[in-house]
Amino acid sequence: MSQTNSHAQAGGTAKPIGLLIAAVGVVYGDIGTSPLYTLKEVFQGGYGVEVTHDAILGVLSLIFWSLIWVVSFKYMAFVLRADNQGEGGIMALMALARRASAKHPKLQMMMVVFGLFGAALFYGDSMITPAVSVLSAMEGLELAFDGLDHWIVPMALVVLVGLFLIQRHGTARIGVLFGPVMVVWFLVLGALGVYGIMQSPEVLKAVNPAWGLNFFIIHPGIGVAILGAVVLALTGAEALYADMGHFGRKPISRAWFILVLPALLLNYFGQGALVLGNPETVRNPFYLLAPSWALLPLIGLSTMATIIASQAVISGAFSMTLQAIQLGYIPRMHIQHTSSDAQGQIYIGAVNWALMVGVIMLVIGFESSGALASAYGVAVTGTMLCTTILVSTVMLMLWKWPPLLAVPLLICLLLVDGLFFAANVPKIFQGGAFPVLAGAVLFILMTTWKRGKHLLAERIDEGGLPLPIFIGSIRVQPPHRVQGTAVFLTARSDAVPHALLHNMLHNQVLHEQVVLLTVVYEDTPRVPSAQRFEVESYGEGFYRVILHFGFIDEPDVPAALALCHLAELDFSPMRTTYFLSRETVIPSKMDGMARWREALFAFMLKNANGNLRFFKLPFNRVIELGTQVEM
């Protein structure tokens, strides 16, 4: 997604066809590379499905109607409408659902749990997608050259490591190629599909849902389980919603119905026709669908497509991390902007290296796309289920849809998502434990950070000196005042910041203008400049300033304070000093969190990026004072 924000900013003036091509290059990379492995996994994934006429048509019918129901119906008709001021993605949706359930604290807490768990699974997906996609592309070399089996993993690792190494430099320059390359990819998918269908046109009968129902009848023991492989055709569906803020709902929908959906369906049916005529081709129906002379060019194109798909989820992880930081669920990290033109193009080193290590472990541990497919479905279906639950809350409590209309619809949506998720639960014991464990660890980290910050604020507030009493004492015994403005960052509005008390204690002076600054993040993506600040005067040169930012805004505090000249406050750069407080947590037996979580929070707090960099404060105008807090 880092390559997409330039499109977002130009979205108002970009030609529709250009925006559509750009959307194809970013939004549909993941779901567009699913034909590489989906049908092969159904018949080769150990489900016990025999390659028969009825089984092939049954599986194709399930794939067809899954794409129609989940993507064309659920996402296009409903999920994409649940935008948070134009922004999509599970964190934005969680903020929307949290706002919708504000009057019901228990329900609101449940929305946060589902949102955080869905986000945690997305990080697991961000590791699995590059691994399974690039491996599946490289596996085509086994058909082109004998004896290359042992080189597939090393070559995939070279491509993937190279992809992660270039992240810090940004992808703006090569990003302009993503759209055209993916358009060519989908055209090739469609052409190969038509080529296959022409050999066995009867495969088109699978459009009839009766074939899908018949599959469940003739395979009663594995009917639901096979949905765990069919769902691979839906991987990347969440990207349609996550990237909505970059392109808008209409370009994403048009790209789906005009190009992506027809190309995918043609290719799946073409693969089915190939296997119908020659069951032995089930070992790799995607590549065997191509004429022998086109195999090497197709491998090259597949590799480019999977790199683009991988780039999309990596950039998506960066974007979601930024949102989670702003919403207070992840410690602050160093965020590097990789483009001077597009504000949203970012790189987060800690996330990049963590993803790279995870991807390397997956490739070495699983060694093939087929083995990795079992891990894929759990992350995908878990995130989709969480999204549906959050959208349900928005439909009923924010949009105020009539229950008689909404409830039956939501039951159907949840039933289908629940079936897909249930089909993948057994995979937890067959390699699918990785995304679940990764999701559980990340969920613990996020909830520990959020709870820890809340407890830390409570401990700091205990015994705090009320601001009116402090200002009253200054009136009685005025301290020496020096020229300039002192800005003290604080989370509370009714108590004196510790940094201010320490400064008074050690320096015995006050600035002529003292500003108690609180930064507040809203549940909306952006806050207009006109609503950026609130100012309140307490007298004696004391002011309360509250700055409001959205969860995708860049929190540039000096720039925001410059707007306060409208309230006759002076924030001249060379006359303003920023005072920060740096807390060190000491775990104790006090009530709050388990000791191990307190220790974990203390470690996270110690290694978190400080306010100085995060708020873009000038290095030479900052004084940081430390304090120890028992928890």
Swiss-Prot record:
Pfam families: K_trans (PF02705), K_trans_C (PF22776). It catalyses: K(+)(in) + H(+)(in) = K(+)(out) + H(+)(out). Keywords: Cell inner membrane, Cell membrane, Ion transport, Membrane, Potassium, Potassium transport, Symport, Transmembrane, Transmembrane helix, Transport. The keyword Transmembrane helix applies. Transport of potassium into the cell. Likely operates as a K(+):H(+) symporter. The keyword S-adenosyl-L-methionine does not apply. The chain crosses the membrane at residues 17-37, 56-76, 109-129, 147-167, 174-194, 215-235, 256-276, 288-308, 346-366, 378-398, 403-423, 428-448. It is found in: Cell inner membrane. GO terms for molecular function: potassium ion transmembrane transporter activity; symporter activity. It comes from the Bacteria. Its main location: membrane. This is Probable potassium transport system protein Kup. Belongs to the HAK/KUP transporter (TC 2.A.72) family. One of its GO terms (cellular component) is plasma membrane. It is a multi-pass membrane protein.
